[in-house]
Amino acid sequence: MAIITKVSAQKRQGRYNIFLDQEYAFSVSEKTLAEFVLLKGQELSPQKINEILDYEASAKASDLAARYLSYQPRTIKEVTDYLSQHEISRSAAKRAVNELTHLGYLDDAAYARLFVKNNLQVGKNGPGAVRRDLKKKGVDDDLIEAALADVTDEEWAGVGKRLVKSLLGQQGKIAKREVDRKMQTKLLSHGFSGSLAQAVTQDLVPEADEDQERAALVKQVLKAYKRFKRYEPGVREQKMRQYLYSHGFSGDEISAFLVGEIIPLEELEEY
């Protein structure tokens, strides 16, 4: 049996050093000190020392986890990973997580609902990306689907419009179909389905404006001409056709330009 010969407070508030048989043995929190009533002269068996150290590890894990949660909500996996990074044993981490779950501080279902709500309010991700992000955070599939279930297509469309509204500034600069393509590509990359992406695009840019389309064609024609005018006529025409096609203009529109219907070809140098 070892005897506690000294209990001294550390400079760090709430921490205490325990000396057994005149030698430093371990340190504990105030919570552990009170739980085991650790006082000078107390005898401790090896089993009791292990019990104290085990309790202290759990208390440390709980304190670390609570501090981590104080900044923002977390998932069970995030807290478990955080404790592991701080060299908390698996058993102590599990006890801390169970305690915080029992107290209601850890709740993956509530976290998933809040995550979805925040995305609807200020985020720019579609359901696919939200689902993927929650899976990375360790949330169970059933909880993810439950959180997504009440979100309507109209609500997702609102998120999608927020994501791609900056592309509206390209109207009149590139062809409408190219604006549509860019919007849908961006929406798909952020987890929106094809049908949602199409609905958002159609709602934002319902139909082509003839004046805007003509202005966009003229703008790109001038860019293309300046870029390729050094080539021989045949090569220049081919390169300009490819350039304009890549910017969303139809074959008929491109042909109309190449025969001088949009801008007389002899006037291109004047622009």
UniProtKB/Swiss-Prot annotation:
Extract one GO cellular component term from the record.
Answer: cytoplasm
Q: Which Pfam families match?
A: RecX_HTH1, RecX_HTH2, RecX_HTH3
Q: Provide this UniProt record's keywords sorted from A to Z.
A: Cytoplasm
Write out the GO biological process terms.
regulation of DNA repair
Location in or out of the cell? Cytoplasm
What InterPro entries would the database entry show? RecX_HTH_1st, RecX_HTH_2nd, RecX_HTH_3rd, Regulatory_RecX, WH-like_DNA-bd_sf
Alphabetized HAMAP family for the sequence: RecX
State the family it belongs to.
Belongs to the RecX family.
Which function does this protein serve? Modulates RecA activity.
Per its record, how is this protein called by name?
Answer: Regulatory protein RecX
- This protein's species is Lactobacillus delbrueckii subsp. bulgaricus (strain ATCC 11842 / DSM 20081 / BCRC 10696 / JCM 1002 / NBRC 13953 / NCIMB 11778 / NCTC 12712 / WDCM 00102 / Lb 14)
| Gene that this sequence comes from | recX
